[in-house]
A protein has these predicted regions:
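Periplasmic solute-binding protein
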Residues: 93-101, 121-157, 184-209, 297-306, ...
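Conserved C-terminal helix/tail region of periplasmic/extracytoplasmic solute-binding proteins
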Residues: 52-53, 58, 151, 360-411
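Extracytoplasmic "Venus flytrap"/periplasmic binding protein-like
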Residues: 45-117, 124-126, 148-159, 259-260, ...
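A structural signal for short loop-to-beta-strand junctions that line the ligand-binding cleft
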Residues: 82-83, 113-149, 177-180, 293-294, ...
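Extracytoplasmic/periplasmic substrate-recognition and gating elements
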Residues: 48, 52-53, 153, 226, ...
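Glycine-centered hinge/linker elements that transmit conformational signals in sensory
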Residues: 170, 210-241
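Hinge/lid segment of periplasmic solute-binding proteins
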Residues: 88-141, 165, 192-194, 220, ...
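Long, aromatic- and glycine/proline-rich binding clefts that accommodate carbohydrate-like moieties
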Residues: 117-123, 284, 332-380, 387, ...
Length: 411
């Protein structure tokens, strides 16, 4: 009996070892924070499609809630890495790249021709000349405007800063607040700073600033606030914006009390539900200010291979699959967002169609101030932007405070 038990134990050990090897070779472990209904459905569809196309691979998905994922990602990348992990582009990706926790996937980009297909997101996926993941979905930011109010006041869609400021003056004179905004939650101010900085100083400067490489007291940052002054000082934003959230500013826009709204495309749904039609609601690109390439804010969700992943070969197959035009078309139809692959089928929705055209031709993509800057800097920055918008004369004091925070945060 003892001999039988010994053999049984030995065979069990061998079987477990064999299972571990086969799990490593044919199992792909994915950690994601796609816990909301639409992202979860999109990931379910993507995984199902991948397994159908690659029957030799079994995919295991671990889904975390957003906050839990953010706090545990560094731990599992170090201690028990999956084969695929979801994250974000730009400066949010940089700490993991710099800590050697993400794998260089430039080979996938080269093999699949992604430098061309994913061109708009290439800069935000590149560090030290190498690519560190694949983007699969994003959405546009821009200015939503009331076509009917523009028409009534003989305003053409502005494409330059001078034209935008002139349109604001015309609207104000007609008793219409030029811009709806609600800054109670602070982050909407980040969109304004992003666009003004990217249009005044360009994408590279904006990335350097949010990475802590430039003082907030720099004259180039002062130049951003010179432009912002042209909107804050004449009262071109809703007067009570610090006391309301972004959703609470939608009614003023719908009633025609305000004519424009700088916001992400997620705002279209509440605008339509409140009664605006496509004849009334238009979308435009944030106008040109200085002669710099036009970058856009487009928060981008990305897929990465941990540096210590066990099954990198199948992980690379998954990245190539997720980058394809067909898959990005299908996944984004579920998400109600935009495919990054420029060869994907154009969306039928008017505003997504406008966004797809704009982002496909973008020079580069910002991820939004609170993604591009570290949490402590982003919080202080957006508090400062709100204070400045309420009280433009506080500008000097605000920028000096932000500079002291920058020195502390980026030690």
């Amino acid at each position: 009996v003892k001999t039988t038990q010994r053999w049984t134990a030995r065979w069990a050990t061998l079987a477990l070892a064999a299972a571990a090897v086969s799990a490593q070779a044919g199992t792909l472990v994915i950690n994601t924070d796609a816990s909301d209904p639409a992202p979860k459905a999109a990931w379910d569809a993507m995984v199902k499609g991948f397994m159908a196309a690659n029957p030799d691979v079994t995919v295991k998905v671990n889904t975390f809630d957003h906050e839990g994922f953010k706090t545990s990602i560094r731990n599992f990348l170090t201690a028990d890495p999956p084969d695929i992990v979801t994250w974000y582009a730009g400066n949010r990706m940089a700490p993991f790249v710099n800590a050697n926790l993400f794998d260089d996937v430039s080979d996938v980009w080269k093999k699949e021709g992604l430098g061309d297909k994913l061109k708009s997101a290439a800069a935000s996926m590149t560090i030290k000349g190498k690519q560190w993941g694949v983007p699969y979905t994003y959405y546009q930011w821009g200015i939503y405007y009331r076509k009917d109010i523009f028409e009534k006041n003989n305003i053409a869609v502005p494409t330059t800063w001078k034209e935008l400021v002139a349109a604001c003056a015309t609207l104000k004179k007609a008793g219409v607040t030029p811009f709806a905004i609600g800054t109670k939650a602070l982050w909407p101010t980040g969109g304004w700073f992003d666009y003004l900085n990217m249009r005044v100083n360009g994408y590279e400067f904006h990335m350097d600033l949010t990475a802590g490489k430039v003082p907030y007291t720099d004259k180039r940052v002062q130049a951003v606030f010179d432009r912002w002054d042209e909107l804050t000082k004449p009262g071109y934003f809703l007067a009570n914006h610090a006391g309301i959230d972004w959703q609470d500013a939608v009614p003023a826009f719908v009633k025609g009390e305000a004519a424009m709204y700088l916001m992400g495309n997620f705002a279209v749904d509440p605008m339509k539900k409140a009664g605006l039609t496509e004849d009334q609601l238009g979308f435009m690109q944030f106008p040109k200010i200085n002669d710099v390439p036009m970058a856009e804010d487009a928060p981008t969700d990305t897929i990465h291979i941990p540096a210590r992943a066990k099954n990198k070969a199948d992980a690379r197959r998954f990245l190539a699959y997720a980058a394809s035009a067909k898959v990005q078309t299908e996944v984004n139809a579920i998400l109600g967002q935009l495919p990054v692959n420029k060869d994907a089928t154009k969306p039928s929705d008017t505003y997504l169609k406008d966004g797809f055209a704009m982002l496909s031709g973008a020079y580069a993509l910002g991820q939004f101030y609170d993604r591009d800057a570290p949490a402590e800097m982003a919080k202080a920055g957006m508090e400062g932007f709100q204070r400045y918008m309420v009280k433009p004369e506080s500008r000097k004091e605000v920028l000096e405070r932000l500079e002291s925070v920058r020195k502390r945060v980026y030690k």
